[in-house]
Amino acid sequence: MKQKADNLIAQNKKANHDYFIKETLEAGIALTGTEIKSIRARRINLRDGYVQIINGSAFLENVHISEYKEGNRYNHDPLRSRRLLLHKREIARLAGIQAQQGMAIIPLKVYLKHGFAKVLIGVGQGKKQYDKRQTIKKRDQDREIHRKYGI
């Protein structure tokens, strides 16, 4: 039987531009009813989001999930902190990484897997301005080689 591909909802393209992604990790998200309905409608923005470890729990901060239009008075706060569902050893490892200088834990993608919302979080090290220029230069060189030789 053919496996159904994960249903990609949102992607943080700015993360690959601003960070060197060292490793990735999949986590579940604790959501309310109107939040999951808004996510299914693809009304989520990951651009300024980050993960913070507080008292042994991981939280997704500053991720904007728009209010559900039929949610009336039961709607959620668009920028509230959302708990990530991870094992204790994963949270402990992320807490150690978060304590290091220059390391950030950021959301890369949000997708639906078997009906549940999942977030792919990445451990990244911030790029300097010259690193960004080198990345652009390398991309242009690769594009030129591909255009010239058809590799």
From Swiss-Prot:
Pfam families: SmpB. It comes from the Bacteria. The keyword Cytoplasm applies. Residues 132-151 are annotated as: Disordered. The keyword RNA-binding applies. GO terms for biological process: trans-translation. Its main location: cytoplasm. It is found in: Cytoplasm. One of its GO terms (molecular function) is RNA binding. One of its GO terms (cellular component) is cytosol. Keywords: Cytoplasm, RNA-binding. Belongs to the SmpB family. Required for rescue of stalled ribosomes mediated by trans-translation. Binds to transfer-messenger RNA (tmRNA), required for stable association of tmRNA with ribosomes. tmRNA and SmpB together mimic tRNA shape, replacing the anticodon stem-loop with SmpB. tmRNA is encoded by the ssrA gene; the 2 termini fold to resemble tRNA(Ala) and it encodes a 'tag peptide', a short internal open reading frame. During trans-translation Ala-aminoacylated tmRNA acts like a tRNA, entering the A-site of stalled ribosomes, displacing the stalled mRNA. This is SsrA-binding protein. The gene is smpB.
